[in-house]
Amino acid sequence: MTNPSEGTSSSAQSLAYRYTPELANAIEREWQNYWTDKGTFNAPNPVGDLAPEDGRELPGDKLFVQDMFPYPSGAGLHVGHPLGYIATDVFARYNRMLGKNVLHTLGYDAFGLPAEQYAIQTGTHPRTTTMANIENMKRQLGALGLGHDPRRAVASTDPEFYKWTQWIFLQIFNSWFDEEQQKARPISELIPLLESGEIPTRDGADYNGLDRVAKQKAIDEFRLVYRSNSTVNWCPGLGTVLANEEVTADGRSERGNFPVFRKNLSQWMMRITAYSDRLIDDLELLDWPEKVKSMQRNWIGRSRGAEVDFTAEGETITVFTTRPDTLFGATYMVLAPEHELVDVLVSRGTGSYDGVDPRWTNGQATPAEAVAAYRASIAAKSDLERQENKDKTGVFLGVHATNPVNGEQIPVFIADYVLTGYGTGAIMAVPAHDDRDYEFATVFGLPIVEVVAGGNIAEAAYTASGESINSANDQGLDINGLAMVDAVARTIEWLEEKQLGRGTIQYKLRDWLFARQRYWGEPFPVVYDEDGVAYALPESMLPVELPEVEDYKPVSFDPEDADSEPSPPLAKAREWVEVELDLGDGVKKYTRDTNVMPQWAGSSWYQLRYIDPTNDDQFCNLENEAYWTGPRPDVHGPNDPGGVDLYVGGVEHAVLHLLYSRFWHKVLYDLGYVTSKEPYRRLYNQGYIQAFAYTDSRGVYVPAEEVEEKDGKFFYQGEEVTQEYGKMGKSLKNAVAPDDICNNYGADTLRVYEMSMGPLDTSRPWATKDVVGAQRFLQRLWRLIVDENTGEVLTRDEALTDEDNKHLHRTIAGVRDDYANLRVNTVVAKLIEYVNYLTKTYPDTIPTGAVLPLVVMVSPVAPHIAEELWKKLGHTDTVTYEPFPTFEEKWLTDDEVELPVQINGKVRSRITVAADASQEQIIEVALADEKIALQIEGKNLIKQIVIPGRMVNLVVK
């Protein structure tokens, strides 16, 4: 390989030889151009366009490092954004030096609400703003010297990318989940099972007796993607429905802060719940932070318990409970206001509130009026708000249900703290042993019956375990005196014997709402015939591209108008919507689906496209996937699930993105498209760079860089302002652009500073004034090797002293361990210590053997200066693939050690002894020391304590 300035008059050479920001910028530009021109970071694939042209075999040792898909924001990057990108680059560079084939690249997650909202604010088409944002982000990241393989970069908005997003959607759409095999299978394998009757239809109808439309509907009920007329979060202000995860605790949209209402709509759903057990159980296979695993377990919310059948007005009301042992304490029932039986029960009940406790009626005359008014009052509440609401409200339905264990008639209510999304949407209320039920019973004057011993129910619900009491009937059930586990088991056994219930498992996880009424997203590869039957488009018709439209804004409504209906922007593009297609039985008229996929779609599989980005025939060749992400039991153990070797990003994606991508990946695994069971083998959550922000007396943020500090107070344009600490961002007026730091100090200085600020997984405060410390370290490194006046190299051929070798090999050993474990802050500390030692020891010229390994060790964290120094030391190849230095054990231990000697706990002298000296020898040397001998003369030596390698303590009187 050649070097950037070889054979030319380099701009860097025309500058002064001192390592100034100007020289740093020139060096960085040249080496960045060199890396691009030479394809330095291009990682070869086993097969396909990215395979080695010379046919050489790839290293068996590989590493796939990945950053979380960034949004190309219109605001650009601030210095907090590159923290994770720099860390993964350091890790990737280090591993290249270990001889590994390293895949590291970066793409852009550009569909979805953030990009669309920004485009609407600026009045520019989202495609235009997105492309401009991507180019700006490429420029900003490129200036940091990140070692990405540019051939593998993708954007979720590129039709050649979302063609495969649509293709994967179709694979999921054309699959069903086989409960017996616990895996996805093609729909084509379901149809013969329906025809033979081996698997019944969901409603029990004879499949062979159904007409074409009915057969299609019967099949659709098994699909992993289906349309459901269900309760969704409708946001009129945004003109779209939102997933639960996109709604704040106070019932507003996360983006835009608009009111959100619960509404019944027909929407695309993905049957992620079919994978609940695998999504929980396979967490044990992953090298992820326990905090993230716990968040996913809690989100899925697996609970073991029983379904119990209560009866009311000829209807069966099934409840799910984890505590069937408390059935004898159930004194009322509560249904979710949206429960399908509410209106049926009201119509069959008394129809009147005559003689009913006024607390149960909510001020209404009839149950029907009360239900209607109550539903209206809670329409704007989110699920989270309903669950957290301390004020218990509800209304009586005018009916009673029969408790199956004792025959008691108990009143039936609706209340907002019961949700349709968990369990069965109905609960048996046991106020003596559940806090929320206790609060409700207290407000409504309902009976509280103790059935678990150990508490004082006159004061509060008793929710701990204890022996069952007051729990027996004359039908063969008596659990009095049993502990909880045994009481639960016996109750379930009795319920099953009497066919009044059954043991079961329930989950909090709901199916994934997979449609948005927006413009800027992936179109669905689905059309509908005149009967409304959905048809998946064949692969030959992909991608279904977004039409170019003039009016791409969503049809939004009065934010408070809960009765409004979604009207997707794509519905306006009639020429695109209404099509004539031949789907195998002649040309017919169809209409396209006018919803788009949610912003999570592209990020649910993008790591696989990084592997094979130029493949026109497959989303990812299986041989390439197996090489980069396939299981490696010989390296990672027999239960290795495979996946990306290191995935770095913020903990805010712990549930949504990671859960969705795991679901998609498992479907692809079941269908044989990937060899890895999981998308990400190891996950690392980096911390955040935070900063001070300042507000004036009106609470308005002022530019942080213009604030002055005087006597512990802060002033902006002469007015005192208030300091606060937290996020960095444009709206807070405290964002620092990486462009400015690179221009004023150099990219290597920014990299070193961000990596030295503290452990990668913790948050840390940004302070521009401290950046100079990183710059001075690099300047000292430069001066070790380069004469600032002449530009001459200051090295000489000379053997290292024993002291040199000790410092060098200890630095190598420490740095290797720290790089391998992402402790880059301590890498920088060790390199600074070694540079300081060399600076002090060699003020003029320096042995080449002392600095060659130093340059290699510096190169992952400060690659540009390392490349330049490597060149000056006589090398013609890039330092990128130079083998990382190794250490010799003999230099890691001392022949002699110095130990402090204490007398009665106070240090009185220091002694030098052989590193392997016995305790007797150490005491002998200590007692012979002149200072110690004087201190203990004439005193009694009571005790002699030796802590090997650390100290000696003599106790005297």
Swiss-Prot record:
Q: Name one GO biological process term.
A: leucyl-tRNA aminoacylation
Enzyme class at the top of the EC tree: ligase
Question: In this record, what's one Pfam family?
Answer: tRNA-synt_1_2
Q: What residue intervals hold the motif 'HIGH' region?
A: 70-81
UniProt catalytic activity: tRNA(Leu) + L-leucine + ATP = L-leucyl-tRNA(Leu) + AMP + diphosphate
Keyword Protein transport, does the record have it?
no
Recorded protein name is Leucine--tRNA ligase
Q: Which organism is it from?
A: Corynebacterium efficiens (strain DSM 44549 / YS-314 / AJ 12310 / JCM 11189 / NBRC 100395)
What gene does this protein come from? leuS
